[in-house]
From Swiss-Prot:
The keyword Membrane appears for this protein: yes
Comp. bias intervals (Low complexity): 202-217
Chief site of localization: mitochondrion
Ranges where the record places region Disordered: 179-258, 309-351, 390-419
Membrane topology: Single-pass membrane protein
Listed name of the protein: Uncharacterized mitochondrial protein urf-N
Residues in the signal sequence: none
GO cellular component: mitochondrial membrane
Transmembrane intervals: 71-91
Lineage of the species this protein comes from: Eukaryota, Fungi, Dikarya, Ascomycota, Pezizomycotina
Entry's localization field: Mitochondrion membrane
UniProt superkingdom: Eukaryota
Entry keyword set: Membrane, Mitochondrion, Transmembrane, Transmembrane helix
Amino acid sequence: MGNKKKSVGGKINFLELLTFIQFLTHKLTLTPPKPHLFVTSNLQASIWNWPSKSRITEISKAIWMNMIKKFKIFIFFALPTMLIVKGIYICYDQEIWTLVFFTQNLVKNFPFFGLRLFNMIWVESNLGVEASNLGVEAPKASSIFLDLHLWTLMYLFGSLARIFGELYYSDFELPAGVGGESCEKKTPSPRGPLTLYKKGSDSGASGGSDSPPSAKGNSGASSGPNQDRLAPETDSEDETTQTDQGPRSRGYRKTRTRSMVRRRWIRDKPDWVEGLWTRSSTEGVENLDATKASQTKSAAENLDAIKASQTPKSAAENLDAAAIKASQTPKSAAENLDAAKGSKSKSKSAVKKAAKAAKKLAAENLDAIKASQTPKSAAENLDAAAIKASQTPKSAAENLDAAKGSQTKSAPKNLAPITGSQAPKVKAALAEFLGIETSQLQTTAVVRELATKLEDDLPGSLDFADQENGNKIISMLKLREFALQENNRYRSTIYKSLGQFMDPESHKNLKEILDKLEESKNLLMTEGQKHKNTFDRNSQQNTAYNFKGDMKKYLELQNKVQHSQMKNFKLAESIIQKNIQREYKCKELKDFLHQEFPTSCRDFNDQEMKLKKYFLNAFNQAKTKN
């Protein structure tokens, strides 16, 4: 019997797998392996208990086949599943359920070159169309695919170069530095860069600080950790030593570290640096003084306004509180805040002492503010307080209700409240946008008049000879349906946008009317398509049917829908005119509506002229042939 060939997928123990990994490692790093790791015969394998060369080949084949199997599973099952699930999630998240958007996400999320392929198919193709429209030569498809292949090769070779660079980094020679001796093959230690440290308390830990040095430190009089930083350095072998990084770190020439260069620069810094630091400090103090002055001035103005609007008793109380708040400078406020935060750790006596000092400072500033008021301003404030105190309880209650009502109203975003004198302007702005009814309904009125005139001329039955006339009649009615639909759509969109300026109850009533308009629009669209399909089917088959009765039903449906739309339009406009908030700027409201609908009105007017011309021509031709 012949020798049976061992199966490639046999069992592999852990020792064999470890040996195979070591074998591959030595092969890749091009370093000679140890004698017992590479065996050439089964005898040596039995002596050293290592797998033979044939077994190593079988192990490599088994690993390779297993990798191919896993790769096939990933390519044909795992990757498509992940791409499809992610594409569906993105469509759900963006609420865009189109095949093009789903395909774009599949291509974009493909590993390695998916994003590049997406840009090539959709982005660069659109640029090519725009270039052809502008008369510029667009990139060819062959060059785009070549660019894709080159990009993929660059990515793969870049990854391989990075891997081999890390493997063979230790085999490169280091060039000689400036002023240093050329060295033979020296390799840096993988533990970290070579560092120099000074003997003493400062070993370079504090030398990496980027904070600017103080003026005091330049004279060399500072002590503590910064004393060694500002001390002059020497290049002698006694003061600088090398850290022991192993045998591979020997032979390095001495180099200055970052901290040593910074120390020398601080020691020998030019005069303009000191002047720059001094000037910046002076400017900061001046800016702080200006800020304090502006805050004190604004606080005094606010204090006068508060005093003028309050009764004598409440004015005195709020005067004390405002003066205490205004008298605190930013520095004193910060100090008081720190004192309040640290009150848990401080003793009670210290807290009481700080509170007493703050109260004393506030009292002094209050006296200064009171003394700074002129007799005239004090008299005016007293008169204002007396006028407010003389109000009857009824008028005070009315003013209180008015103030509460103005606070409960919520203003829309990007719109500021206005005074009552500007309310008519807001009303005029609304009338301007709601007055579009006249120009928009002219189209439907003309169509309705033409359809009424043609109603008596509709033939009772249709044969092949009347097909052209029937096409014009059904086209006219379809155009009237289109005009009704556009009028409904445009006005409903305006009503929906104006609803954001209304109170919730009125907005709810307006939404019910908008739902009715949507129902009428859908009804007209569905029934109109049915009549059109009936006409097309009978005209193609050249069969007689009650064309006049069918068109009358279609016309009655249009009249019914138009009557319902007009009724709902008036209800919606009355709700808007009665309940929209009047305290918003007229210009901002107009800008908002113009921004939302910049060309709808103009497009409708252009469409109106075209429809009028077409309807008149169709009417004249139909009357002439009949």
